[in-house]
Amino acid sequence: MADPSLNDNPTACPHCASSQAGLLCVCPAGKSPVLVVEMSQTSSIGSTEFFASQERKKERNTSRESSLKDLSIRTSNVERKPQAQWSRSNVTVGKIPHIRMDDGAGIEEFYTFGRILGQGSFGMVFEAIDKETGAKWAIKKVNKEKAGSSAMKLLEREVSILKTVNHQHIIHLEQVFESPQKMYLVMELCEDGELKAVMDQRGHFSENETRLIIQSLASAIAYLHNKDIVHRDLKLENIMVKSSFIDDNNEMNLNIKVTDFGLSVQKHGSRSEGMMQTTCGTPIYMAPEVINAHDYSQQCDIWSIGVIMFILLCGEPPFLANSEEKLYELIKKGELRFENPVWESVSDSAKNTLKQLMKVDPAHRITAKELLDNQWLTGNTLSSARPTNVLEMMKEWKNNPESDEETNTDEETEQSAVYSPSANTAKQPTNAAKKPAAESVGMTSSNSSSSKLLSAESKAEPEKSSETVGHASVAKTTLKSTTLFRGKKRL
């Protein structure tokens, strides 16, 4: 419930109602300056709208201080209309504060800036410490003027998507501070840096180490795809390592986080199957359909996962060329080569998984959900590798139909044994010979071999009940009909 003592208009000064959104009001009524701020949807903190007012903080009653204790300590001059209990330690889905300021100095009231973690053409990333809790965060500081309108659109898109997601392997956005000149994103700190930097130090990862990384990555991408979000720029540089340790087998275990959602898009069903057409991303990670500028779907992310997995295993990308045009030609052909000596120690199961991830035709490519059940990824490499994509299963049968026919023959033999009547079978009443129409149709549709077999059985067992024979015929006819149907498809 909103505080009745506060003005209902979140973009106006509660004393004189003359301020503009995002500006500091110097109230003509002689009251303390008030900064108008607003809350954005979905994250870990919780609320919708609040005002900044030093005077109102002093006037809070005891019950309000009790219910919003953490907030009152955090925001010496910030007040809000409460809708839910606010807690800094709560990391479940709630609300992300998007705080409007008159200048960038306001954020320093909450955080102490430390070392520079990264630097770009129009921004920097700092390590920062929460003054209240001592927790470490990464703060991305962006100069709006230098960034320009196009870059700001990408940043706003990233913020919008990060406000809607909550996954253990996706970077967490804690708060947003914004002034007319700058924007600050307070994000989860990944102290081990980019996955690419870690890999460059090691050369490549072992198969088990790669498996753990791809498991985490597949989980994050399956989550995004389930929410109709396509990343479109998956690469080693956009995967951060929050922490790592060496296990008892001397294998490195990495806790990864997918980041950089500037090129991401959330489908809303405006196009058939949520198809996209914009060519974007990093060339060596681009899927063939993206390069061709054809309609493409979330399956472009799956190709990128394949490229990442390939690089993790051998230390180099699957396709290399001295020009972008030649690189694109290699990608569109999609011919994977395992020529590096390191591939000799990689299992066939891992190589088969790569082939499923990097099918040129996205319709034949494994999905993120299917990848989570992949035999290599789950560690179940004892059973024979079979495709999980429906189209790939059909293609395999078309190329090798004999295997299915052999299976059907074995099943038919088993069924014949099961339904074969015993010599001691008692004779059933004659009225039991009247069978349903469905069984009659099944018997007449059986092929000649089935008829001969039934005839032989009838001669060998003259006292066999017609009901028993009927059931045997139906069971065997079903199996044989399946084989005949497949034979017709091959013709």
Swiss-Prot record:
Signal sequence segment: none
InterPro entries (UniProt xref): Kinase-like_dom_sf, Prot_kinase_dom, Protein_kinase_ATP_BS, Ser/Thr_kinase_AS
Knocked-out gene: effects: Male mice are sterile due to severely malformed and immotile spermatozoa, characterized by disordered structural tail elements. Conditional deletion in germ cells lead to male sterility, due to teratozoospermia and sperm immotility.
Activity regulation comment: Specifically inhibited by CDD-2807 ((3-([1,1'-Biphenyl]-2-ylethynyl)-1H-indazol-5-yl)(2,6-diazaspiro[3.5]nonan-2-yl)methanone). CDD-2807 is a potential male contraceptive drug: it is not toxic, efficiently crosses the blood-testis barrier and induces a reversible contraceptive effect in male mice.
Residue stretches of biased makeup (Acidic residues): 402-414
Subcellular localization, as worded in the UniProt entry: Cytoplasm; Cytoplasm, Cytoskeleton; Cytoplasm, Perinuclear region
Active site: D233 (proton acceptor)
Annotated positions of the Phosphoserine modification: S403
Catalysed transformations (reactions): L-seryl-[protein] + ATP = O-phospho-L-seryl-[protein] + ADP + H(+); L-threonyl-[protein] + ATP = O-phospho-L-threonyl-[protein] + ADP + H(+)
Subunit: Homodimer.
Protein name (Swiss-Prot/TrEMBL): Serine/threonine-protein kinase 33
Organism of provenance: Mus musculus
Source lineage: Eukaryota, Metazoa, Chordata, Craniata, Vertebrata
